């Protein structure tokens, strides 16, 4: 589920608008893409379809975010969902 903010299963992200995906992380989601996780500090810095961010701000293809910033533990998606 999406940490502190919003809906964890599609629709709403963390304080902002996401398109059928998970918007996780610290702060608002800035344009969470189509069926992807917007992870990291500020949430939504890794644009692209059906991909998840890597560590921090980075990009990643079909990989979950690590701990600290982004999905994993603490901020964002605690269980590391991928759809």
From Swiss-Prot:
Keyword Membrane part of the UniProt annotation: no
Native organism taxonomy: Eukaryota, Metazoa, Chordata, Craniata, Vertebrata
Biological process, per Gene Ontology: keratinization
An example Gene Ontology CC term for this record: intermediate filament
InterPro entries found in the cross-reference section: KAP6
Name the record gives this protein: Keratin-associated protein 6-1
UniProt keyword terms in alphabetical order: Keratin, Repeat
Family of the protein in this entry: Belongs to the KRTAP type 6 family.
Source organism of the structure: Ovis aries
Chain's role: In the wool cortex, wool keratin intermediate filaments are embedded in an interfilamentous matrix, consisting of hair keratin-associated proteins (KRTAP), which are essential for the formation of a rigid and resistant wool shaft through their extensive disulfide bond cross-linking with abundant cysteine residues of wool keratins. The matrix proteins include the high-sulfur and high-glycine-tyrosine keratins.
RPT repeat extents: 9-15, 19-25, 44-55, 56-67
Summary of subunit composition and partner proteins: Interacts with wool keratins.
Repeat as UniProt keyword: yes
């Amino acid at each position: 589920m999406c940490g502190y903010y919003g809906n964890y299963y599609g629709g709403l992200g963390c304080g902002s608008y996401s398109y059928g995906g998970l918007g996780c992380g610290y702060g608002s989601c800035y344009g969470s893409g189509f069926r992807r996780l917007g992870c990291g500090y500020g949430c939504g810095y890794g644009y692209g379809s059906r991909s998840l961010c890597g560590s921090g701000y980075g990009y990643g293809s079909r990989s979950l975010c690590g701990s600290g910033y982004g999905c994993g533990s603490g901020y964002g998606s605690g269980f590391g969902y991928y759809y």
